[in-house]
């Protein structure tokens, strides 16, 4: 057990809002800033449950490459707009809901035009959905589900309505997380850490709520190590087929789930690299040509991919 004469660290919410929060924990023994900040960041980005649009039914539309008479946007554009919809379930036990929209032109259709429901709250009612011209009509049924992480359309394949179009879903309500570790002092001691966590969310959960959930998830998993009988349990065998299926699913993960630093993530996204599959399509020469990607960044990418069982092409 770590011997320390420090009093309990003080947790402070220096900034707290619906979409952004900044939290400080200090003082910590040297090294514990990174020890706590890194896993919390990864959990916040990958494991906080949220809601997302999973399928869309549009009257008289058979597939996503259709156009709608009297509607400026095509179906692909409408679906892209709907993917930005932020919905909060007011009942924590609710697993899914269907939002209904009826509109006639001329009109700019926004998220606030969905039929009101006592069970849900639309957090971005000004979100643009479509533009209807004179005589244009639009009827939609949009299914919203609760989930975790990223689920491609072909995996959840929701078809609870004939001609419903499945949609790729990013459930995470956490948009971005950054942490910083600085030196701090207490009395004569100057070898202490100050951890600052900055969290951005979509507003369906507050940054503090997301942080509390991440802490609970981390505690739950650390408790597995405290069970002395756990090591006596037989390790389940995983078939080759299950391994292949798991690897295929990992290919479709968004880059955020690799736990890369914000700087590296930004450099890759600037080049249009959004998924593990897209990253693995590049070789080392390709990556070195990306602005902001040096040898240290390459090593970070290698290690992140190795944790998923992947290696970069030479």
Curated annotation (Swiss-Prot):
InterPro entries reported for this sequence: DNA-dir_RNA_pol_insert, DNA-dir_RNA_pol_RpoA/D/Rpb3, DNA-dir_RpoA, RBP11-like, RNAP_asu_C, RNApol_insert_sf
Source taxon at top rank: Bacteria
Reactions this protein catalyses: RNA(n) + a ribonucleoside 5'-triphosphate = RNA(n+1) + diphosphate
Annotated spans, Alpha C-terminal domain (alpha-CTD): 246-314
EC number: 2.7.7.6
Alpha N-terminal domain (alpha-NTD): annotated segments: 1-229
GO MF, one example: DNA binding
Record GO cellular component, one term: cytoplasm
Subunit field text: Homodimer. The RNAP catalytic core consists of 2 alpha, 1 beta, 1 beta' and 1 omega subunit. When a sigma factor is associated with the core the holoenzyme is formed, which can initiate transcription.
Database matches in HAMAP family: RNApol_bact_RpoA
Stated family: Belongs to the RNA polymerase alpha chain family.
Function of the protein: DNA-dependent RNA polymerase catalyzes the transcription of DNA into RNA using the four ribonucleoside triphosphates as substrates.
Protein name per UniProt: DNA-directed RNA polymerase subunit alpha
Organism in which the protein naturally occurs: Thermus aquaticus
Underlying gene: rpoA
